[in-house]
Amino acid sequence: MEAKAVARFVRMSPRKVRLVADEIRGYAVGEALDILKFTNKRAIEPLTKVILSASANASVLNDKVDSNQLFIKKIYVDEGPIMKRFRPRARGRAARIRKRLSHITVVLSD
């Protein structure tokens, strides 16, 4: 049985989220949450929320599922749209600031 959760338009660069996502791929849910607890990155907050959401989705799909037996089968981070902003610079010019968004997908299996 598989359970899936998606967080879209997360206001964080996909490259930075992938660094943390690669660390927890293949681990059991409890073990992955422990790893995230001791990781000092900003990306742990949305990743933790998505993993807990996928775990809750699994319990809705099957009442008898034990969250300790679930493991992260797939976790991937895709690029979302890029918000373009301008920052004033010297001599009347402007520099483009690209604020990147991420889509995080987690698939759990037992």
From Swiss-Prot:
GO cellular component: cytosolic large ribosomal subunit
Keyword terms of this UniProt record: Ribonucleoprotein, Ribosomal protein, RNA-binding, rRNA-binding
InterPro entries according to UniProt: Ribosomal_uL22, Ribosomal_uL22_bac/chlpt-type, Ribosomal_uL22_bac/org-type, Ribosomal_uL22_CS, Ribosomal_uL22_sf
Matches recorded under Pfam families: Ribosomal_L22
SUPFAM superfamilies referenced in this protein's UniProt entry, alphabetically: Ribosomal protein L22
Keyword hit for DNA-binding: no
Taxonomic superkingdom: Bacteria
Alphabetical list of PROSITE patterns matching this protein: RIBOSOMAL_L22
GO BP annotations, alphabetical order: translation
Molecular function terms, GO-annotated: rRNA binding; structural constituent of ribosome
Subunit and partners: Part of the 50S ribosomal subunit.
NCBIfam families in the cross-refs: rplV_bact
Role this protein plays: This protein binds specifically to 23S rRNA; its binding is stimulated by other ribosomal proteins, e.g. L4, L17, and L20. It is important during the early stages of 50S assembly. It makes multiple contacts with different domains of the 23S rRNA in the assembled 50S subunit and ribosome. The globular domain of the protein is located near the polypeptide exit tunnel on the outside of the subunit, while an extended beta-hairpin is found that lines the wall of the exit tunnel in the center of the 70S ribosome.
Protein family: Belongs to the universal ribosomal protein uL22 family.
Name the UniProt record assigns to this protein: Large ribosomal subunit protein uL22
Organism: Leptospira borgpetersenii serovar Hardjo-bovis (strain JB197)
Gene behind the chain: rplV
